[in-house]
Amino acid sequence: MRFIKRFIRTIDAINDWVGRFLSYFLFAFFVLLFIEVILRYFFNSPTVWANELAQMLFGAYAILGGGYILLTGGHVNVDIVYTRFSAKTRAAVDIVTSTLFFLFCGMLLVYGGSLAWDSLSRFEHSQSAWNPPLYPAKLMIPTAAALLILQGITKFIRDVLILLGKDVSAGPTPGKGESL
């Protein structure tokens, strides 16, 4: 049981750190777009690279946040029904629906990993005038899938422990308005 709690705490801490890091990443994204708007509309001097970099940064931000969102209970539920269930019923429903979750994430890991490996092995670059490498952005897909799968495993373990009536207090507790 100690190993399980340590595993849960470790994965929760990793996804919590990634989520917090990404929140600062969003600030950099905002600054980048702000500078581009100023250059484009006030100085009539748009950059070649800002749009493409913004797409890559936001793509990484959006996909890498999945594990953190799962940790804090931010993914979509049918709350009107789900919140009326007891904790054990919610855990049972989550266990049943986790098969779809793991199927999707497994496919994302396998196919995203294949896409990333292909891009990395060819040192793929964009076809734009800026010509940045694309493989760092594509490597975010299997990385995000792995983080999401690991967080899904911790959620699955918590749900099983709830069904068994065990203590599930390992890891950070969700904030106000959030649930695991």
Q: PLM features: residue spans?
A:
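Alpha-helical transmembrane segments and membrane-interface helix-loop junctions
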Residues: M1-L180
